[in-house]
Structures are given as structure tokens and as C-alpha cells.
Amino acid sequence: MKYDHQSIETRWQKKWEDSGIFQCDTEADKPKYYVLEMFPYPSGNIHMGHVRNYSIGDVVARFKRMQGFNVLHPMGWDAFGLPAENAAIKNGTHPAKWTFANIDNMRSQLKRLGYSYDWQREVATCTPEYYRWEQLFFLRFLEKGLVYRKKAAQNWCPKCHTVLANEQVIEGLCWRCDSAVEQKELTQWFLRITDYAEELLADLSKLENGWPERVLSMQRNWIGKSTGAEIRFALDGRDDSITVFTTRPDTIFGATFMSIAPEHPLVEELIDGKPQADDVRAFVERIRNMDRIDRQSDTLEKEGVFTGAYCVNPFTGRKMPIWVANFVLAEYGTGAVMAVPAHDQRDFEFARKYDLPMQVVIQPQGETLDPATMSAAWTEAGALVNSGNFDGLANEDAKQRIADDLETTGNGRRTINYRLRDWNISRQRYWGAPIPVIYCDACGVVPEKEENLPVVLPLDVKTHDDGRSPLPHTPAFYECTCPVCGGKARRETDTMDTFVESSWYFARYTDATNDKAPFTPDALRYWLPVDQYIGGVEHAILHLLYSRFFTKALRDCGFIELDEPFANLLTQGMVLMDGSKMSKSKGNVVDPTEMIARYGADTVRLFCLFAAPPERDFDWSESGIEGSYRFVGRVWRLVEELREHLLAVGACSSTAEDAKTPVARELRLKEHATVRKAGDDLNDRFQFNTAIAAVMELVNALYLAKDELVADESGRKVLSSAVSTVLTLLSPFTPHLSEELWALLGHTESVSTLPWPRWKEDALVRDTVTLVVQVNGKLRGKLDIPADASREEVETLALNEPNVLRYLEGVTVRKVVVIPGKLVNVVVS
């Protein structure tokens, strides 16, 4: 019978769906395991990256079920956002119609791959049933002061017609469309993620055993904790002051000028009436539209312009010119920097360029620095000089002493600064969750009443070809009454950043059909945290950081009782073609649907899992998938050939008594060694490729042993046990093949419901060993002897081996060398 993957796979997929075999419920008396892959944006078609990601998750889910866990393995759709809206506009259709059609198609594709999802828990973030709870969270965050509204310069994508969070600007470009990002003054809604900066940083230690160090490091760097001091510098000739943040208070005596960001709120006041005003304004306008990442680059050419204003160094009393500089960012620290050119490289380059004064205040041991001859700033340790009462102190000690002085005199204070900025969630686009606030001329900003949720996104609107939102031009949506005074009011027409939806979806899966609450405490308590999360490393400082923040904020609002959402994280590698990332523009895309039609879902899954360890990239290759296809066929033919013999003995687990011959004993040993190897690889390391390789070796051993073992019943029992083990071990990887062959062997239960095989210690002990026998170093025979034979017994058996005896005639045996478990060498003369 030919292996017809098309009919076999679709038949088993229907059986699984009809039986609800992968649906799960909260079972307090059973250990749980929650495995989750990052849900996709419904683009219309899955790609090979999806296949690899979801195949990894499915192996984990199936393996954990076989280990006895109650497994939650859900799937849904990250369905709001710019990509869907832009694609729908491009194709002349409504985003809702486009999105739901794509969801239907992708759901079918995922089912065709045989993934063991609990489809009853499916969510789509663009449905009111989902985002109503998100709007509830917004209102509770607003109550708690975790949401606020402010006007500020924002990252603006001119092509997408919306703002971007700092994390969504990659090297000055929009993360979605690669357009150059501009700065634009807008009033926006923000989430206070900075309130959790220290906890987000500290709790990374809880994830050290479960998350890749690379991701932890990326989050540490993004949060960017700096310990230092704020120092106030009086403005010369004014009753005002300017505050700086510095990590180097020990260098305060070396501060010779001040650098401030072009966006600093004091710029206009400082230049008012000064002859430099026009030059400063032109410089500010030019620099504000530069990429902020570029402005932080070490290779950036340092530029600045003098404001005409001065401040006063609180320790030296020296007047310091105030410059606007391109490398100072308003959002870091206070947007002002005390410039110490002798001990900071950026300040050094700036001072050299504009001929500004330089004062050495830290001398290295055994060396005297001279500003006139220095080729670079001295940024290492040393002793303070030219620093008044602090001369001679080691600079680390001086940091504390000078900070003490600042706090005593009131000129400053110790503080901690973070690179992390609050999360701007306002988007000026249509396809997103409405922000549930109302603007009333009499009452101001008013939250929508919870009983009025959801604020439904209207579907009967016409989107604009240029991407502008139709909501500000849709009176039926924005015209409303104030919940406080009942007067005429206007609804917010911005929508939420789509990363808000993906920041809590993992919690909704625990109780996805609940229409009274986002989830119940019992469901959350049982299922969370996610035991294994799987997705790309590109989400390290976007989705993963936002989800951690959201979990903590929901905890503080009484929704959740845990600190971290994901106990373990696996970041899978990419699927490449000829060393490059697959993309339509490069024309190097492999269509999963085409591969499934040609080779079958099991083969596609198997190749994606066998090609490389999950965290590494791998190159797609026709020879590789052909090899996986041949292996699937080889397993099919093996069982088909042995079927009648195996049906005769029935299902069995062979015993030591069944393994009567060396071949039988060797196959039984191989079977149990494979169970141990595959289990260890899946359980501890997720090394799917080596687990598959071990099963392949067992299949090879079966082919070598089958002809001898089918001859008697005990041998057939050993064969039956090994074949059953192969099908069971393969079922997480090639579930359709395993189900079909299991059924062909007369079993009525699903192989997916079987327990993971157990290996036996006694089966891994060889009771005989094979030794080679040499005479004067040349191979003359082989011995199969008991593993526990004594040295004397080994010598006797070797000297009496028939072939060896021929070489001992007429010679004298001088000595016998025995290397246990390997060889015997008879030395003669």
C-alpha cells in the first residue's frame, strides 16, 4: 500500500477535530503545562518562519501531553494594526473584510499542518469581544495614574501617518515601512512603563534560568539604568537654574561648558534677545529631524552652536558657556549635560572642534595629563587634582563625597536615571482599538463608563487611500454625550498601539470565551505563567518588554497575581535561503502550502525540526526535505512489511527473556537507549534534531534485525516493542504517520494519548560483549563472551577460539594481553 500523505493527513486532522482531543480544561488535580508560540499577524498566508515556530511549539505540546501534563496550547490572531490597514487599502477593500478572510485562510493552513491547538480558545484582537477588556484595562490604569496625556515631540512616520514608540524606530526608520522618521509635536496618551523600570530590571534575575542571555542583555540595555547625581547650575544673570544628570560627579571641577539638547525647553528663553538667536533656531530645526539613534552614535560628527548664555559651576564659581549640541537628547536625563572635555570623549571632541577650555581633574597614577597635549579624554580611574578639598581622593571615593556635599548644600541630589521612556500608545490610524475617553468642554477629559464598553470601532467607514484615519471625519463615531454632565462631547479618535493587544493575549487564552470578565482568577492561577514561550528574538525590546510591564500593571490593578508572564523563552532561528532571509522582494520564498502538497505536512515539520537546533538559523534545501521524505517513506515501508508478523503477536513491551539472541538483545538495548536519548533531548534541551537522529538510528537497527527476528515469536515480540517505540517517539514530530501506522497495527486508541515510553536500566546493560582476538597484533578471530567474564575465562576462551588455534600451532605463547571490553592480543614466538 502506497503512503498517500494527502488523504492520510486530512483524515487524521478531521478525526482530531471531531473528537476534540486537544481541548483542555482547568484540572486542579493534574499538573499543567502552558506552551505558547507568539501569535501571527494575519497576512493571508503562513511562511516557513511560521512553520518552524509552530512546529517547535507543537512538538513541546504533544511531548508534554504524553508526559501526563494537562497542556494548554492555543492559537489566535494579532489582527489590528498598520499592516492590515495598508494592505486592505492597497487591495481596495475594508480592513475588517481583509483581516477575517486572511484569518480563515491561515487557520486552514495551520490545521493542514496538524498542529494540536485548542481551537475553542482562538482569539482575534480586532473583535469587540477581545478589545472591550483592553479598554477596561485602560480605564483602570487611568484610575491608578498609569495612563496620562501630554504634548511632546513624537516620532512620526509620514508614510504610515502615525506616531511610533521609541522602540518602533529602527536606525531612524519606521519599523514597518522603512520610511525616515520625523519629529512632530502632538498630544498623545502614554503608559507609565517608567514607573516599573527598576522592577522590570530587577526581575530579569528571575528569568536567568529560563530566558536566553541575549534577550536579558537587550532588555537591560534598553532599560538603561544609570546611577549618579542631579546637579543644579545657576543661570548667570537670572534667578533660574538648569539641572543636569551625571554619572560622574567626581569630575564636576572639570566642567567647563554646558551642552543642552535642541529640544530642551529653556532654549528659547536662553537665546531671547541674543544675537545668536537665528543661528540657534536654524540649528535646532535641522537637528530635531535627525535620527535619535544616529545622534547617539560614537561616529557622529559633534556639532553645536553657542546660545550666548552662561551658567555657573556650583563648585568653582566659574562661568560656563551654554551650547546646544547635536549629541544631547532631551529624553535622556534632564536633556542637559555638564561638559567635562578632559574626561569624556564626546565632550573632548566637541571642545577641540570649538576651541573650548579643558581642565584635568583626574590624574592617572604615575602620569601627568596636560590638556594641551592630550589626544583623547582620560576616562579611567585616578586621583582627583584641581578639585579643591577633594584633591588626592580616589575618584570612586570622590563620587560619594561630592554627592554628600551636593545634598548638604542643596545644589543637587543622588538619583538614578533610566534610558527607558514612557510608552506612547496613541496611533492616528483607523484599524485599532478605540481609546475609551471623551472630551467635554465643561468637564475636560472624561473616561468612558465601564458599563458602556466596548467602545466599538465602526465598520461602516471608508478608509482613505493615503492612510489617514476616517474616525475624525465620522460624526456617528465621535459625537457623544459626556458621561459626567450629559452635555455634548467628542470621543477620542486615536486608536491604541497594536502592541497593547499583544501585551495580554496570553492571559485571555486561559478563559477565552468568558463574556463577563477578561479571565477568572481560578483560570489565571492555574495556567499562568506560560511555561514555554516561543518566538523571534526581534521582539526582545518590543513585545516581550511590554508584556512584562503589562503583567505587573495588571497585578497592581488587582487582575493578576504574578510578576512575570513567561517562565521560559525559546527564540527560534530563521529559515534562510542561500544564506539570506526569505522575502518576496528577493524572490527566494518557499511556499509551505506547495511543500505540504508535494511532500506532506509530516515531512515539512520533520525537516524544519531536523535541520538544526531550534535556536539556530538554517538554510532551506531541496535535498534536506527530500531526505526527510525518504525517512517517512522508510518508516511506512518497515511497518507495512512487518505488519502481519506484528499483528500476530499484538502490542507488547519486550522483556529480557524475549531477547534470546545477540541480535534481539542488541535491538532491545537500542530501543531503550533511544527512549532515554530522545526523552533527554526533548525534556531538558529541546534538541529536536538529535532526538530525531536517535529515532532514525533505531529504524536502521530495525531494518538490520528484522529478517532474523521474524522467524520466532520471541523475536517478533522484540520487533513489535521496538516498532511501537518508534511510532510513539515520532508522534510529536510526524503525528499523522504515527497515527496511521498505529491504527494499521490494530490499535484503537490515538497514539497522541499514549504515555511517553519509559526506558529500563537493565535493558541498557549488555550481558555479552564482543572482543577481537589478535595474534601478534593481527586480527585472527572474534569472541562473544559474558560481560562479567573473569580475566582467566577471557584468556581461556581466546586461546581456544577455533580460528586462533590455527595460528598457535608450533609456536610458544609468551603472554596474553587483555584489554577489557575491547580485545585480546596473544603474543607468540
UniProtKB/Swiss-Prot annotation:
CDD domains: Anticodon_Ia_Leu_BEm (cd07958), LeuRS_core (cd00812). Its EC number is 6.1.1.4. It is found in: Cytoplasm. A motif ('HIGH' region) lies at residues 40-50. GO terms for biological process: leucyl-tRNA aminoacylation. The keyword Nucleotide-binding applies. Belongs to the class-I aminoacyl-tRNA synthetase family. A motif ('KMSKS' region) lies at residues 581-585. It catalyses: tRNA(Leu) + L-leucine + ATP = L-leucyl-tRNA(Leu) + AMP + diphosphate. It comes from Nitratidesulfovibrio vulgaris (strain DP4) (Desulfovibrio vulgaris). The lineage of its organism: Bacteria, Pseudomonadati, Thermodesulfobacteriota, Desulfovibrionia, Desulfovibrionales. Its main location: cytoplasm. This is Leucine--tRNA ligase. ATP binds at residue 584. Keywords: Aminoacyl-tRNA synthetase, ATP-binding, Cytoplasm, Ligase, Nucleotide-binding, Protein biosynthesis. Pfam families: Anticodon_1 (PF08264), tRNA-synt_1 (PF00133), tRNA-synt_1_2 (PF13603), tRNA-synt_1g (PF09334). It comes from the Bacteria. GO terms for cellular component: cytosol. The gene is leuS. GO terms for molecular function: aminoacyl-tRNA deacylase activity; ATP binding; leucine-tRNA ligase activity.
